[in-house]
Amino acid sequence: MRKILKLKIGRDELVFETGFMAKQANGSVLATYGGSSVLATVCCSNNVREDLDFVPLSVEYNEKYYAAGKIPGGFIKREGKPKDKEILVSRLIDRPMRPLFDKRFGREIQVIPTTLATDQLNPPDIVGMNAAFTAVFLSDIPFNGPIAAVRMVYLNGKFIVNPSFEEIHDSDLDIVVAGSLNGITMVEGGANEVSEDILLSAIDSAHEYIKQICNAQKEFLDIVGEKEKLPLAFEEKIFEFKEELRDFIYADLKEACFVKGKLNRDKAITLLRNKSYEHFSSLEKLDDSNESLFYKAFDDFEKEIVRNSILNDKIRTDGRTPNEIRDILAEVDILSRTHGSSLFTRGETQALAVTTLGTSIDEQIMDDIDGDKRLNFMLHYNFPPFSVGETGRLMTGRREIGHGHLAQRALESMIPGKNDFPYTIRVVSEILESNGSSSMATVCAGSMSLMSAGVPVKRQVAGIAMGLISEGDKYVVLSDILGEEDHLGDMDFKVAGTENGITGFQMDIKIENVTKQLMRDALEQARVGRIHILSIMNSVISNSRVGISKYAPKIIQLQIDIDKISLVIGSTGKTVKAITDEFEVKVQIEQNGKIILFGDDDFKMQKAKEKIESIVREPKVGEIYEGTVKKINSFGAFIELTPTKEGFLSTRLKSRDSKYGSGRFGHGNRYSRFGSGGDNIRGNAGLVRPPKLEEGQRIKVRIVDIDKFGKIDLEIVRDKDY
């Protein structure tokens, strides 16, 4: 039976419906906000696996073109592989939800939110998140919900919940916040150099709306009726010889955890793990039935040692104090033929960033249900397996897309507008080494690479990854975390920004008791670390290069009247194609009359500009043109001044001392065909005729008269006349 629940959030009602669509799924909910609707389903496998030590969850958010009344572009008229946007939204749904599933469930879980309608006003991603969370909460799958999500923006000094696309575009802060009744679990977004206080206030405001949605989900569960939960696949077991294992390894493991260098530390721990395995196997206390429990117990001891050292002794595995940042080395211009490059090394994490400048033809075209877009700034993040000393496939996964998007958002508020810098900008980050915080190393390397390329960015942007170790009311905030601290810690949050404020933010919280004061302390510690990193980056390069690389395409811009655009294009594009071929340039013509020329040769580009200016320029008496003889008849020749203008050169005899503007004489009214003789005819001294002309010949002429109908009369210009 169809069940409906409504609540007011922001400008519109958020509507949940269930019991009438996708009824064979373990859970299904249709969520609608304004005119945007998303159907979310959740299903689990019937196969139970007891050997899983993780949650086998997959989230596949997808958008249908029919939702916006569109048919997919391109040759194939069917939705294809997931777009980057769909992958990013899938990650937004996955991250806050994954920790709330019980690992003992032992079955694969798949959540599929599908956008069925969009009103082009309300972004469907937030609708999809709440549809997915509610579908799982109402299902028979064990889940520690409810959770909910909202988007908050800061616009004109006010916070707006679930804003429109236009409000998002105009805002200074745009974040997506997910959480439960007890606290925040995830935050992600970008900003235009906002303060830490504004970010905290936005998160606080978001949590109030999140609690409303969570309470509505509980009310909806009462209306629908709670399903009997599926049983857990296994009870949590512990290694029965755990205390013996502690006695055997603890002292050696404590020493191994603090070996300097990631590879050396991993090697020492692995040797000790293998030694322990062989020891307990020889005692016949280890077999296939408890092997996984042995490894879990070993990992628990490692986690206990590291966390206790940080909480009690304030010493991390690499010897640093909690707020200490690893050694940093920054370089620029390390690649000779690229348009801009930088190498940023922080401890054992290293990012090589390369900036390439292109033309508007190189823009990324986004065929999206929210409307077609053209992106002139892109950042691509690559994480090859050698960066962690491993082998593997070279491919772009969801993690790479997510990290690249975070770094791109952190930098894009510093990118100049198209009017100021009409280039397409692509930054590629190659992670050459990784031991934590590679996405923030990408921000730092990318910022310096942009300056190296001569992109007039406003300021340097630096990023830092922060962590948290807590126990009860006791906590320690960590600056510039290692990979293992990310894994063993209670919170992972990344902050990017300038010396003036925050530009990018991502946070995932694994515990519920994160207080506002804790977050304030963490953000302040991140700010101090960010300023330190910026000081090192600015000592290497603090301002963008003056001018771009000689290997980058050159650009010239000019503005013409809108009604002259057709003159530049010409019939069936004939004129603009001729300019392109003659001067070896690319010509972009915009609807507002702006013309952008792209090319590699400054001289040819300048000539192309002059050509266009001559095409759109209104002719004036006295101006000199180098024209082409198009046609000759008995009375004179038609001279093409520009592809859109012609003048007439009469065969009438001209006076040597005539002045342009008179055009005709009262005497010497004699005509002759071209090529009939010399300059002087029958003693008429001072009278001249044009030299012999041929069609296609180039000749310098001066405008001597323009009548009221626009007819242009010309005279020949000799070298001694100008």
UniProtKB/Swiss-Prot annotation:
E.C. designation(s): 2.7.7.8
The UniProt record lists the keyword Translocase: no
Family named by the database record: Belongs to the polyribonucleotide nucleotidyltransferase family.
Positions of Mg(2+) binding: D486, D492
Localization of this protein: Cytoplasm
GO biological process: mRNA catabolic process; RNA processing
GO CC terms in record: cytosol
GO molecular function list: 3'-5'-RNA exonuclease activity; magnesium ion binding; polyribonucleotide nucleotidyltransferase activity; RNA binding
Role description: Involved in mRNA degradation. Catalyzes the phosphorolysis of single-stranded polyribonucleotides processively in the 3'- to 5'-direction.
Listed cofactors: Mg(2+)
Subcellular location, principal: cytoplasm
S1 motif domain boundaries: 622-717
InterPro entries for the chain: ExoRNase_PH_dom1, ExoRNase_PH_dom2, ExoRNase_PH_dom2_sf, KH_dom, KH_dom_type_1, KH_dom_type_1_sf, NA-bd_OB-fold, PNPase
Protein's recorded name: Polyribonucleotide nucleotidyltransferase
Native source species: Borreliella afzelii (strain PKo)
